[in-house]
Amino acid sequence: MEQQETIHISISEAAQTHFRRLLEQQEENTNIRIFVVNPGTPNAECGVSYCPPNAVEETDTQFEYNGFSAFVDEISLPFLDEAEIDYVTDPMGSQLTLKAPNAKMRKVADDAPFIERLDYVIQTQVNPQLASHGGRVTLIEVTEDKYAILQFGGGCNGCSMVDVTLKEGIEKQLLAMFPDELAGVKDVTEHQRGEHSYY
């Protein structure tokens, strides 16, 4: 069993109170388990369940909160870094919310190769914005002159808004984050046309 300091999972006071109320009705020493199903994929789903004392594994990591602990299995662990659990009450009722920005893709180190850090930002920040249009972006390569070559898929493919979205939105966002390592972004079709412009 490990105590983990480098991975951070935030549980709000309201959510902790909610968990304590639920755990009072369970057998003694029951805690909670936080997990990710299909971690590292676009279909990743996070969940919370009861964790009876006999269900704790040697390889679990324990996070201690006020009045209970949360256990995380070793596979889910890196994908739950920076996760936030809250208990929200509104006129429609109360519900538990779980945000895990790294569930679909493991966080990369600050000193990782530029292409990995860039891909991480595209997967965790750019694609969720495009998902509402049914689109997504894939990083194909970074050229020697520091251009990121992107391929649009789904609802973005062949969409007349691609140029506007690409130039104004995504390029601006990525250049702000990587001012020294990136010169701009290009759509893969534009990049290929440029390479074969003598046809």
Swiss-Prot record:
Source superkingdom: Bacteria
Positions of [4Fe-4S] cluster binding: C156, C159
Keyword terms: 4Fe-4S, Iron, Iron-sulfur, Metal-binding
GO molecular function, one term: 4 iron, 4 sulfur cluster binding
Cofactor binding, note field: Binds 1 [4Fe-4S] cluster per subunit. The cluster is presumably bound at the interface of two monomers.
Any one Pfam family match given in the protein's UniProt record, by short name: NifU
Coiled coil: none
Record bears the keyword Ribonucleoprotein: no
GO biological process: iron-sulfur cluster assembly; protein maturation
Co-factor requirement: [4Fe-4S] cluster
InterPro entries according to UniProt: Fe/S_biogenesis_protein_NfuA, FeS_biogenesis, FSCA_dom_sf, HesB-like_dom_sf, NIF_FeS_clus_asmbl_NifU_C
Oligomer status and interactors: Homodimer.
HAMAP family xrefs: Fe_S_biogen_NfuA (MF_01637)
Homology family: Belongs to the NfuA family.
Role noted for this protein: Involved in iron-sulfur cluster biogenesis. Binds a 4Fe-4S cluster, can transfer this cluster to apoproteins, and thereby intervenes in the maturation of Fe/S proteins. Could also act as a scaffold/chaperone for damaged Fe/S proteins.
Protein name: Fe/S biogenesis protein NfuA
Organism encoding this protein: Actinobacillus pleuropneumoniae serotype 5b (strain L20)
Record gene name: nfuA
